[in-house]
Amino acid sequence: LRASASEKSEKLLTIPDGTHIECTGWQSGWAKTTYEGKTGYVSAVYLLYDGKVRADGGLRLRSGPGESYEKLLTVPDGTVLPCISQGDGWVKTTYNGKTGYVSQDYLLVPVTVRASTGLNLRASASETAEKLLTIPNGTVVQCYGNKENEWARVAYNGKAGYVSYLYIAYD
């Protein structure tokens, strides 16, 4: 756990492997969290999360991170998969004893809105984009697809759009 979102910042403490933490925000690839009374940042490289498959007909588990890689098997819609690592729109995961990659676009991850006045859902990943609606504080929404800069793609009340990563927490 570091004091700021940087490898060079002060190390506050070490969080044991396998510990469940709540992410209360994001900054340049770092998750903000509180552990043993200390608030700081953990590199997202060291975090695992679960995602739920949302693909009619299932999701292809591939041997590598791309559509050109061999299809190992199909993961059924609704299956919850562990995220081992991620990058360039692909998540490394395991299913039925096989390790491979799935497209991040077809995984749903529950996140909770952490903004006292609610969080604006925007048409695109920009503060100046059209505001579609406001999601109330404490609402759990499904985050899916790739992170675009500091924005997460979510759906709420039948509308899809983007919210700032600074105001969501992974459950």
Task: Name every feature range the model reports, one short phrase each.
Residues 1-32, 54-92, 114-151, 166:
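Beta-loop motif signature
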Residues 6, 22, 32-52, 94-111, ...:
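Boundary regions of SH3-family modules and the immediately adjacent low-complexity/disordered segments
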